[in-house]
């Protein structure tokens, strides 16, 4: 059996990589992918603690996070496609200048 520490270290590494992508990258698609990576790190943490405790609450929480991530991805990609069609670019600087 793999200790929970390994799962938590992997989740922390995934979350840090996602946070780095959100803070550093300028492309909206890469930022969305980084947010998804952070959500997957949270899922890994939920499932690891559920396995340690022996209950299903972590699995249910992970399914809920997956549903929220799917909705976020669908809405986010629709916004990115609309911005690309109107501006021709998906850089975050272009999104900041959309004030009318």
Swiss-Prot record:
Entry-linked InterPro entries: NADH_UbQ_OxRdtase_chain4L/K, NUOK/Mnh_C1-like
One Pfam family name from the record?
Oxidored_q2
Chain segments annotated as transmembrane: 4-24, 29-49, 63-83
Question: Which topology term describes how it sits in the membrane?
Answer: Multi-pass membrane protein
**GO cellular component terms attached to this protein's record:** NADH dehydrogenase complex; plasma membrane
Relate the assembly described in the record: NDH-1 is composed of 14 different subunits. Subunits NuoA, H, J, K, L, M, N constitute the membrane sector of the complex.
Q: What is this protein called?
A: NADH-quinone oxidoreductase subunit K
Q: Which organism is it from?
A: Myxococcus xanthus (strain DK1622)
